[in-house]
């Protein structure tokens, strides 16, 4: 044998290597081994299913439901030995089995019996072609490709030359055309992998009737007309006829063809709940998907995991079943928000963008050691008093679209956290309303801007200022945070000490949260936001984390007063804003405009201007305990009297006739920003247009009464 004949050709670069080499000397590719096709039937089977279910057309990116195998490459046999010539080829996976085997070793398919019409040459190896004595090294030579073309068939889709024994293209999985009709179908077929079911049926019929030598002759039954193109390896060995498998495949194919982008995102979100992937849920929510959507029978069949998915399940059901507490906090809040919402920022996008530019222009960085960002304008958002002039039905519709009813109910009814004092809520017109906003980690920033300017932090302007302030003033905020965390732990009897490296790691994590859009924020970030606003922030929130069963999991630690303690008092405003906290979600708490009162609190020096709205925010809880002041230094910590004195220094405080210590929030429509006023008016006009229809109907009823 010549030197050229004993070498083996690399299937990638065609370099001829010595027989002792196990890898290609040039490209380091693995040497092909064996006399059968080197593509594992199990891999090829899963690859077929993966390609059929490939969601690339949905633009949803990678999916845990789809596992395509795009790494399949053609493998070439080096030679045909006499030993392999006696083997028979499986008609399903083309694996070469020993002559004595009655079933395929790989896929367990039944060996076909010898047909009377088959020639002796084809009976031993099924559909395996006669071996040609062609040097495998010379086969990759461009000059000799024409001589070996008889061993290959060219795919009509990707033009790859496949071995004669291959029933489907190794590269694109396109079926091999066997006659003129099938070739015409292949030419008119779309380039995508989605195959029309009628064309597939025609192709099967033509193959079963026009290729009697390649396949067994048609039986008395019509089994050959519904023969499968390929077999799912996981179903090989399962009890059931080929007709049932074919029907199952066609059903899955039809389901997949009906799937849209939102459907794939929903299935990925379901898998994300099971596997703990929050990103899949966020992707589904951001696409506008319905959180309360239920799994259908077809979707459960496509997921193919009965132990996890069942018909009628929603994302909430799956989160409960797999105990995803963090996801439940988001999903339960989102389910209640399926009603159409219409807040002022949504009505006029042009005005909203102008307000965002105004906020960005009013952000400045203070010069000096404490280089924190701050806002130059004092703006407080309130609901317009004109709402009370609308008919009751229109008012109800307005509140449904602008308020978060679930948050309002939890803070008012389930726990007396806000509006627990009839004196404040009724007589002093200081009832607080929870505005609806986005969920996830941006809710704190959204609620802060809603309580001031009435818009979202859509462009992350406030988040960027938060991150830059934390980064540039890291030493100042780090000292306050470290002292406060140490004191808070000791107040609960937890006496421990951490190394400085551990403190630094925790602080680095807090810094990283501020820079990531959508990341949840903590108490430290509220403290920094109070400095950016240059005004106090009062948080009214639930005291305990609870599971969906109502079990207490721990303290929330958010409720309390956050003062801009690192600024000079003369540089800050004393009018606070109020936020609500429930189930990992922040909401802006705003009041409704009133006409102002002269002397409603003991020791209060109120502005008598009728245009000024004064809202009384309690500084005690329903049990008359003083709210905690967060991030106090060791010198500022003291008893309740000392903390009350500190609150009076930073806030305009007074005591009501009922003995409730309150802080006064002052706002004025005339002094408010004109863009905010214009935005609110446009939003209110939307509901004023509903009024004439209701008024006309009432008038008609009155006329009918007069006639009677």
Curated annotation (Swiss-Prot):
Region (TRAF-binding): 392-641
Active-site residue list: 443 (nucleophile), 585 (proton acceptor)
Pfam family, one: AnkUBD
EC number(s) from the headed UniProt entry: 3.4.19.12
SUPFAM superfamilies: Ran binding protein zinc finger-like
Any one GO CC term of the record: cytoplasm
Cell compartments where the protein resides: Cytoplasm; Nucleus
Signal peptide: none
Effect noted on mutating residue 12 to A: Does not affect binding to 'Lys-29'- and 'Lys-33'-linked ubiquitin
The keyword tRNA processing belongs to this UniProt entry's keyword annotation: no
Domain OTU per the UniProt entry, residue ranges: 432-592
Residues bound to Zn(2+) 2: 90, 93, 104, 107
Residues noted as binding Zn(2+) 1 in the record, renumbered to the chain: 10, 13, 24, 27
Reported effect, residue 443 to S: Abolishes the deubiquitinating activity but not the binding to ubiquitin chains
GO BP field: cell migration; cytoskeleton organization; positive regulation of Wnt signaling pathway; protein deubiquitination; protein deubiquitination involved in ubiquitin-dependent protein catabolic process; protein K29-linked deubiquitination; protein K33-linked deubiquitination; protein K63-linked deubiquitination
Effect of residue 25 to D: Abolished binding to 'Lys-33'-linked diubiquitin
Phosphoprotein is among the record's keywords: no
Amino acids binding Zn(2+) 3: 155, 158, 169, 172
GO molecular function: cysteine-type deubiquitinase activity; deubiquitinase activity; K63-linked polyubiquitin modification-dependent protein binding; polyubiquitin modification-dependent protein binding; zinc ion binding
Keywords tagged on the record: ANK repeat, Cytoplasm, Hydrolase, Metal-binding, Nucleus, Protease, Repeat, Thiol protease, Ubl conjugation pathway, Wnt signaling pathway, Zinc, Zinc-finger
Expression by tissue: Widely expressed.
Record note on quaternary structure: Interacts with TRAF6. Interacts with APC.
Domain notes: The RanBP2-type zinc fingers, also called NZFs, mediate the interaction with ubiquitin and determine linkage specificity. RanBP2-type zinc fingers 1 and 2 (also named NZF1 and NZF2) specifically recognize and bind 'Lys-29'- and 'Lys-33'-linked ubiquitin. RanBP2-type zinc finger 3 (also named NZF3) binds 'Lys-33'-linked ubiquitin and shows weak binding to 'Lys-6'-, 'Lys-48'- and 'Lys-63'-linked ubiquitin chains but it does not interact with 'Lys-29'-linked chains.
Protein name listed in UniProt: Ubiquitin thioesterase ZRANB1
Organism of provenance: Homo sapiens (Human)
Record gene name: ZRANB1
């Amino acid at each position: 044998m010549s030197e050229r004949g004993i070498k083996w050709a690399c299937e990638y670069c065609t370099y001829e290597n010595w027989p002792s080499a196990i890898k290609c000397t040039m490209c380091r590719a693995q040497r092909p081994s064996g006399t059968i096709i080197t593509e594992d039937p199990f891999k090829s089977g899963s690859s077929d299913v993966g390609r059929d279910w490939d969601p690339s057309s949905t633009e949803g990116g990678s999916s845990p439901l789809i596992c395509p195998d795009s790494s399949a490459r053609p493998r070439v046999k080096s030679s045909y030995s006499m030993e392999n010539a006696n083997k028979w080829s499986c008609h399903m996976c083309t694996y070469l089995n020993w002559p004595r085997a009655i079933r395929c070793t790989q896929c367990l398919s039944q060996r076909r019996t010898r047909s009377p019409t088959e020639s002796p040459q084809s009976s031993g190896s099924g559909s395996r072609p006669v071996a040609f004595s062609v040097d495998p090294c010379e086969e990759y030579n461009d000059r000799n490709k024409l001589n070996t073309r008889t061993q290959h068939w060219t795919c009509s889709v990707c033009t790859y030359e496949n071995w004669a024994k291959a029933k489907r293209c190794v590269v694109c999985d396109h079926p091999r055309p066997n006659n003129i009709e099938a070739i015409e179908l292949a030419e008119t077929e779309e380039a995508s992998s989605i195959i029309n079911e009628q064309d597939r049926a025609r192709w099967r019929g033509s193959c079963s009737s026009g290729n009697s030598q390649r396949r067994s002759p048609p039986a008395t039954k019509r089994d050959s007309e519904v023969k499968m193109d390929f077999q799912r390896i996981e179903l090989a060995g399962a009890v059931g006829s080929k007709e049932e498998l074919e029907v199952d495949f066609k059903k899955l194919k039809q389901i997949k063809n009906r799937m849209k982008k939102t459907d794939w995102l929903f299935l990925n979100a379901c898998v994300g709940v099971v596997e703990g992937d929050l990103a899949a849920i966020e992707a589904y929510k951001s696409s506008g998907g319905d959180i309360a959507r239920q799994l259908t029978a077809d979707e459960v069949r496509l997921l193919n995991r009965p132990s996890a998915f069942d018909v009628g399940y929603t994302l909430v059901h799956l989160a409960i079943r797999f105990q995803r507490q963090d996801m439940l906090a988001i999903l339960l809040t989102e389910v209640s928000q399926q009603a159409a919402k219409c807040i002022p920022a949504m009505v006029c996008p042009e005005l909203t963008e102008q307000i965002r530019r105004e906020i960005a222009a009013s952000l400045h960085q203070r010069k000096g050691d404490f280089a924190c960002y701050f806002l130059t304008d004092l703006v407080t958002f309130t609901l317009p008093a004109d709402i009370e002039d609308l008919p009751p039905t229109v008012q109800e519709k307005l509140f449904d679209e602008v308020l978060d009813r679930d948050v309002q109910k939890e803070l008012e009814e389930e726990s007396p956290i806000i509006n627990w004092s009839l004196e404040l809520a009724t007589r002093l017109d200081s009832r607080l309303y929870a505005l609806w906003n986005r969920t996830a980690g941006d809710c704190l920033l959204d609620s802060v801007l809603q309580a001031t300017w009435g818009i979202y932090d859509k462009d992350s302007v406030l988040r960027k200022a938060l991150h830059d302030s934390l980064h540039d003033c890291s030493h100042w905020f780090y000292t306050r945070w470290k002292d406060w965390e140490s004191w808070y732990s000791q107040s609960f009897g937890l006496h421990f000490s951490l190394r400085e490296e551990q403190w630094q790691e925790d602080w680095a994590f807090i810094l990283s949260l501020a820079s990531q859009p959508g990341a949840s924020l903590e108490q430290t970030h509220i403290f920094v936001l109070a400095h950016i606003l240059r005004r106090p922030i009062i948080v009214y929130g639930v005291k305990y984390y609870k599971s969906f069963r109502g079990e207490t999991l721990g303290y929330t630690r958010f409720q309390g007063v956050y003062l801009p303690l690192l600024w000079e008092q003369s540089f800050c405003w004393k009018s606070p804003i109020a936020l609500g906290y429930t189930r990992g979600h922040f909401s802006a708490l705003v009041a409704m405009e009133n006409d102002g009162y002269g002397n409603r609190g003991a020791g209060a020096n109120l502005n008598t201007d009728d245009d000024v709205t004064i809202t009384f925010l309690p500084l005690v809880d329903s049990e008359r305990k003083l709210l905690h002041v967060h991030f106090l230094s060791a010198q500022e910590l003291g008893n309740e009297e000392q903390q009350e004195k500190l609150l009076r220094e930073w806030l305009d405080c007074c005591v009501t006739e009922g003995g409730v210590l309150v802080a006064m929030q002052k706002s004025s429509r005339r002094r408010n920003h004109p863009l905010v006023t214009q935005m609110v008016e446009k939003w209110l006009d939307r509901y004023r247009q509903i009024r004439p229809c209701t008024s006309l109907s009432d008038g008609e009823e009155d006329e009918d009464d007069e006639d009677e």
